[in-house]
Regions:
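Cytoplasmic-side transmembrane-helix entry/capping segments in multi-pass membrane proteins
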Residues: 40-48, 70-76, 96-107, 131, ...
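Ordered, amphipathic secondary-structure segments that act as subunit-interaction surfaces
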Residues: 80-117
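Structural signature of hydrophobic alpha-helical transmembrane segments
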Residues: 9-21, 66-80, 124-137
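Short, highly charged, low-complexity non-transmembrane loops/tails of multi-pass membrane proteins
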Residues: 214-244
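C-terminal ends of transmembrane helices
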Residues: 25-35, 58, 83-96, 141-152, ...
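Hydrophobic alpha-helical transmembrane segments in multi-pass integral membrane proteins
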Residues: 58, 112-123, 166-181
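Short, structured motif recognition centered on aromatic/hydrophobic residues
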Residues: 44-48, 55-61, 130, 134, ...
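The first (N-terminal) embedded transmembrane alpha-helix
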Residues: 14-27, 45-48, 167-170
Length: 248
């Protein structure tokens, strides 16, 4: 109970949570509108996109019932985002960079929000980082499953999870500094804002300059001899012809 009171009395923490909820809800609602869903489906998709990551975090923290279902303010904020998207959809859909910026902003805000809440519940730094990433990425994962698409964190080759992880790690360091009396509350607010700015900048720069994470190493010239000669029946490989199988 004392922990919940501490969270609810932190105006900056509450502001981050509400702003992240609205931004993330706008992105989720737009995805549902593009799929041609009805208003109820838009509301559900927006709500789960905005608060799904936080629900996962709260369940893992044991903070029950989760804020995503118990906090009327957060639920209303998510639903307002859905209504806003449904009304101004044609205009919003044309603003590619604006929506990308909103998504990046939600990513940074939720990274700070989720990690800070985990640290307030006296989780270890590693656990707080994972819970922060669950908060930042969980809603998007749920959104993409609802609209039957490969999750953005998987299909987007630009930096997406990486900025979130960086933001979570930096937030842990700030929280540890606060706990040890090294960082004051005003300094914590400034540092949290800078962390959000860094996450947003990393995300947008990676998209603008097409910076991608490397994949598997190409090994086109490597030949592995077939082991079909040791089998009673030959195995036909889809990328080899019969001469490859007979080769010793």
């Amino acid at each position: 109970v004392a922990m919940e009171v501490a969270l609810e009395s932190n105006g900056f923490f509450i502001g981050i949570e509400y702003l992240a909820t609205f931004c993330c809800g706008m992105v989720g609602g737009l995805a549902a509108v593009r799929k041609g869903y009805d208003i109820f489906a838009i509301l559900v998709t927006t709500w789960l996109t905005a608060l799904g990551g936080g629900i996962i975090r709260d369940v893992l923290l044991g903070a029950l019932p989760p804020a995503g279902v118990s906090d009327k303010g957060l639920v209303i904020t998510a639903l307002l985002a859905a209504v806003a998207v449904a009304i101004i959809y044609p205009e919003v859909d044309k603003l590619k960079w604006s929506m990308l910026s909103l998504d990046a902003l939600a990513l940074g805000l939720y990274a700070v929000n989720g990690t800070s809440k985990a640290m307030m519940y006296h989780m270890s730094g590693t656990t707080a980082v994972f819970l922060g990433m669950f908060t930042a990425l969980g809603g998007g994962l749920i959104r993409d499953m609802l609209i039957n698409e490969v999750p953005m964190v998987i299909r987007d080759k630009h930096w997406y999870a990486v900025p979130s992880a960086v933001g979570c790690v930096l937030t842990v360091l700030v929280c540890k500094g606060v706990n040890e009396g090294i960082v004051s509350f005003p300094a914590e607010v400034v540092l949290d804002v800078l962390i959000v700015v860094l996450v947003v900048a990393m995300r947008l720069i990676s998209v603008f300059f097409d910076i991608q994470l490397p994949g598997a190493l190409a090994r086109h010239n490597t030949y592995l001899p077939s082991e079909a000669k040791y089998l009673k029946r030959p195995v036909i490989h889809p990328d080899r012809n019969d001469d490859d199988i007979k080769r010793k």
